Amino acid sequence: MRLKKNDNVLVIAGKDKGKTGKVRYAYPRTDRVLVEGVNMIKRHSRAKGQAKQAGIIEREAPLHVSNLMLLCSKCNKPARIGSRELADGKSVRYCKSCNEVID
């Protein structure tokens, strides 16, 4: 999976198309990520004694990575990303449009 925690992404498909946010958590096994403020769902919770109140809670749901594009920090555009190996053997991600190393 090419998206990591704290990446800025743009939603390119679905009900939140056009929104941007930061990746809060990545689920590599299912190719999904949790993005701040995007794909909000409502959960109904029951009261558990005096500690937890009953009510409707809004929270983010994971999105599939195919519906997201990384926002390049150099060219400030949504970009396809690739990976390449540096001379020292370290693998890094790079923006395919401006050819800059992302991390």
Swiss-Prot record:
CDD domains with a match to the protein in the record: KOW_RPL26
Superkingdom in the source lineage: Bacteria
Keywords (A to Z) from UniProt: Ribonucleoprotein, Ribosomal protein, RNA-binding, rRNA-binding
Entry GO MF terms: rRNA binding; structural constituent of ribosome
Cellular component aspect of the GO annotation: ribonucleoprotein complex; ribosome
Gene Ontology terms describing biological process: translation
Protein family (similarity comment): Belongs to the universal ribosomal protein uL24 family.
Annotated HAMAP family: Ribosomal_uL24_B
Subunit and partners: Part of the 50S ribosomal subunit.
Matching PANTHER family: MITOCHONDRIAL RIBOSOMAL PROTEIN L24
Function: One of two assembly initiator proteins, it binds directly to the 5'-end of the 23S rRNA, where it nucleates assembly of the 50S subunit. One of the proteins that surrounds the polypeptide exit tunnel on the outside of the subunit.
Protein name per UniProt: Large ribosomal subunit protein uL24
Taxonomic placement: Bacteria, Bacillati, Chloroflexota, Dehalococcoidia, Dehalococcoidales
Encoding gene, per UniProt annotation: rplX
